[in-house]
Amino acid sequence: MHAVLRERLAAVGLSLPEVVAPVGAYVPAVQIGNLIYSSGQLPMVNGALAMTGKVGAGITPEQAKELAQVCALNALAAIGTLCNLDDVAQIVKVTGFVASAPGFTGQPTVVNGASELFGALFGDAGKHARSAVGVAELPLGAPVEVEVIVALR
């Protein structure tokens, strides 16, 4: 399952992670018709946050961009619990939340970590609508959270 996507990930030196266990009373993803909505995904690696803190105060925008990519991979893993990821017809919407220090306004650059990954993996089908939002705090002290909506063939 997910053979084509796994090949594309390997070509850019990445792999699909295990699904992150929810940290609350929710499921990783929900399907309605041909749309799948991921829950917000944190930059969890092997069950722990890769980093904590705020972007612009201890975490650089470059580090946060890499963390957004981790979030995007975790979102794909969550979505993949409900479908074969090779059946994704379109990345519809990406919403990125960035825990931002006062005065930090580079949220779009941070969320590009997710957007650029989807472009690399899905080509034109990776082009999506997007919001990049600065927030005061995120769950568990995470610097970035990403949620994704995909359409299936």
Task: Label every model-predicted segment.
Residues 1-153:
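Short, polar/acidic, helix-capping and beta-turn segments at strand->helix junctions
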